[in-house]
Curated annotation (Swiss-Prot):
EC number: 2.3.2.27
Organism: Arabidopsis thaliana (Mouse-ear cress)
Keyword Cytoplasm attached: no
Keyword Isomerase among record annotations: no
Location(s) in or outside the cell: Membrane
Protein name: E3 ubiquitin-protein ligase ATL9
GO BP annotation list: defense response to fungus; protein ubiquitination; response to chitin
UniProt domain comment: The RING-type zinc finger domain mediates binding to an E2 ubiquitin-conjugating enzyme.
Any Gene Ontology CC annotation: membrane
Amino acid sequence: MAILDTKSSRWIPHNLLFLLLLLLLQSVPYGFGQTQTTPPGTTKTKPNDPVVVVITVLFLVIFFMVFGSIFCRRSNAQFSRSSIFRSTDADAESQVVRIRRLTARGLDAEAIETFPTFLYSEVKAVRIGKGGVECAVCLCEFEDDETLRLMPPCCHVFHADCVDVWLSEHSTCPLCRADLVLNQQGDDDDSTESYSGTDPGTISSSTDPERGMVLESSDAHLLDAVTWSNSNITPRSKSTGLSSWQITGILFPRSHSTGHSLIQPAGNLDRFTLRLPDDVRRQLMKTSRTMGHVALLPQARSSRSGYRSGSVGSERSAFPYGRKSNNNNRRLHSLSFSFSFRSGSVRSTFSGDAPKNLPTSIEAGERSFERLRPDERV
């Protein structure tokens, strides 16, 4: 019995161990295959989940942005290369012309020389207006022995040395930005008339025989008569004394590309403007184009040239006109003028006979202009 007891006692632990091993082997697949279930009322969250999501989204956005920019740049480069290769000869020529226009915007020397060039002493006596005339580039008043260059479209005048530097780089007036590139016309008269139509300050002289006439001689085209008529003058305002175009300039100032005005448009603009009669300016244009150097105007003594109305004063002096040519010397003509204040015209005659309508005294012809004479009263 003792032996059986001892054997049975040894058998029991071995059996227990074997049974436990079987139970473990049976429970292992079931434990790994099951999922942990949470109660429906509770949610399991981790504190680091939002930060991870935000960082991931940022990285994705940055990646797509960099990739998109690189792709767009590569595609644009390929498209530009293909368009250049597909361009025709006409397109290439147009691109070359456009590049040349952008690089060379100034006027050439021949175009600059077509602008009238003269001495200030030659036009000082016949210009319209009072006060000195200044150069807008160097802001110096003109002297009698200085060479000036006139811009025909706007009648602004500058020193030839000052404005030539500007014109070599630009094709506009340095003061008002007027375009100086005009189509060359065959007839000089037509070209000068196209210029004169843009200037509001010049006094036009009519070609009507009743108001004046331009005489031609076999030796030269001389300026025989200058018409200053009150009917051709820009109307003035009775209250302010300013002309209509000056009032318009005050109310509506010129706007420039840089957003500022170069000068004040009211009275300061007259300092840089040389206003001449149409006949004188036409003669300047002809002389500058034919002779190709400094134009020489006939010396004329001005009588009371400071008045804007352009009325001729009491001096009835002869106007000697003459110009030297390369071939021969021109004759000097002396003209005597008779004035008819009833018709407001100037008539020229080569005879010594006095006209019938000549006023008997100086005061007879100046009575209507007594208000313009500040110091003298009749």
